[in-house]
């Protein structure tokens, strides 16, 4: 009887150790298919214009939000908005621009066995815009200036899961397209043929899987 009890005890320890080992080797699994994101952003300076001139902005900080849904355990579809304040120092322009991204896209993750890290790559399409208010000190009037256009881009980053429902998220996003839609006080202006404008954003925030 004593030998039988020892054999059962040894078998239970072996099974528990094997189950714990298998569990530790499993990749992290979010607690929900839905995900809500909030993040801070840092956008590098960019240039908007054509062969005859351009408007150059400086690097700036901002914030954004996203909402997404896991179509599969690895594929996320999402939509979001991101706004960054960028300085400018051009003749006739002295102040700040608001750089806005409104985008929809998808991200593919690459689970790592036994790790809380979850790397991903993605792609997006959307609309970007630069907006500001131009003050004419000679006349004392102000005008709203906006430059916008469609864009496409790629992104990459990594999540670190603090728990199945909360992950720290950091990444980079690159967008390319023309901002040829120019408006002053809502009236469209002729910009000619604009060059491609590249925007680069670094982001750091958190994902919540409710």
Name the predicted role of every residue range.
Residues 1-32:
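Cleavable N-terminal export/targeting peptides
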Residues 50-55, 90-94:
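Short, solvent-exposed loop/turn segments at secondary-structure boundaries
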Residues 26, 32-47, 51-53:
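Transmembrane beta-barrel domains of Gram-negative outer membranes and organellar outer membranes
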Residues 172-173:
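Internal, hydrophobic beta-strand segments that form the core of beta-sheet-rich folds
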Residues 57-64:
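Short catalytic helix/loop segments, enriched in acidic residues and glycine
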């Amino acid at each position: 009887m004593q030998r039988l009890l020892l054999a059962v005890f040894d078998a239970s320890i072996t099974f528990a150790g094997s189950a714990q080992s298998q569990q530790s080797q499993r990749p992290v699994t979010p607690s929900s298919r839905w995900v809500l994101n909030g993040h801070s952003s840092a956008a590098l300076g960019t240039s908007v214009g054509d062969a005859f001139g351009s408007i150059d902005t400086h690097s700036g900080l901002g914030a954004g939000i996203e909402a997404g849904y896991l179509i599969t355990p690895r594929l996320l579809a999402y939509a979001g908005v991101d706004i960054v304040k960028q300085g400018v120092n051009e003749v006739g322009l002295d102040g700040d621009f608001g750089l806005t991204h409104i985008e929809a896209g998808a991200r593919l993750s690459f689970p790592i066995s036994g790790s809380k890290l979850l790397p991903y790559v993605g792609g997006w399409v959307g609309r970007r815009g630069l907006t500001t208010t131009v003050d004419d000190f000679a006349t004392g009037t102000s005008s709203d200036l906006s430059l916008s256009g469609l864009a496409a881009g790629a992104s990459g980053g990594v999540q670190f899961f603090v728990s199945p429902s909360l992950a720290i998220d950091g990444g980079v996003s690159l967008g390319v397209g023309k901002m040829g839609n120019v408006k002053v006080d809502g009236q469209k202006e002729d910009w000619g043929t604009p060059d491609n404008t590249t925007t680069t954003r670094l982001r750091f925030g958190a994902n919540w899987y409710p």
